[in-house]
Regions:
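N-terminal alpha/beta PP-like core and its mobile active-site loop of ThDP/TPP-dependent enzymes
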Residues: 2-231
């Protein structure tokens, strides 16, 4: 399927699946907050396998111009995000649906953890009203991801979606690089909130300007000062 045709199909699917949305500019959905926050963190591509729990995120990514690469297996998506992060030095992003979508990505996330690769894994979950009640593909994702990530948490309010993505991205680049995981329930993604209550942190202001292992350009600066010193 061509990129343009895929984009159109995702857009129509998202529109058909979501509850009727307000067109007012003073409200924003959780899915669009995810996309805006990812864009602020420099993400221009997400790797995923399409799933119903995360369809709202695709809708936001299409509006924000973030490329959606839809693969055949979530392990592939996780490895692709890892490879993207290693080659670009930027935050890689893998988005999976609940249950087997998350578990299929575990090997790729574990590889990123041992390789100190900065990737953000966003996973879907059933609605909060159905959490841990045996709903479709409901599993303890955060518990499973905690040992192989630097940061793993659920997001339980739409207002905090962007804030939590910023926090997770910060952990990816703090100290030794590595992956973070966020679980976002379907109703949190689908809900609309006043835009004023959903603050999106400024991008990148929390990050160090040098690599944790020593940026060659910054090491050369004091070396040059020492060489030119008279005493």
């Amino acid at each position: 399927m061509s990129d343009s045709k895929f984009t159109g199909e995702v857009s129509r699917t998202a529109s058909d699946t979501l509850a009727k949305k307000s067109t007012a500019g003073d409200v924003i959905s959780g899915g669009h907050l995810v996309a805006k926050a990812l864009k602020n963190e420099g993400v221009d591509t997400i790797f995923t396998l399409c799933g119903g729990h995360i369809i709202d995120i695709y809708d936001g990514c299409l509006d924000e111009g973030i490329r959606i690469i839809d693969v055949r297996h979530e392990q592939t998506a996780a490895h692709a995000a890892d490879g993207y992060a290693r080659q670009t030095g930027r935050l890689g992003c893998v988005v999976t649906t609940a249950g087997p979508g998350c578990t299929n990505a575990i090997t790729g996330v574990a590889t990123a953890f041992r390789s100190e690769s900065p990737i953000l894994h966003i996973g879907g979950q059933s609605s909060l009203t159905q959490h841990r009640m045996g709903s479709l593909q409901d599993l303890p994702h955060v518990d499973m991801m905690t040992p192989i990530t630097k940061f793993a948490s659920g997001v339980f309010s739409t207002e905090r979606v962007a804030d939590m993505i910023s926090m997770a991205a910060r952990e990816c680049f703090s100290g030794a690089y590595g992956p973070s995981y966020l679980e976002i329930p379907r109703d949190v993604l689908d809900a609309e909130v006043p835009a004023a209550r959903a603050v999106i942190p400024k991008p990148g202001s929390y990050r160090a300007s040098v690599k944790s292992i020593g940026d060659p350009a910054d090491i050369e600066k004091p070396a040059d000062i020492l060489v030119k010193a008279e005493r």
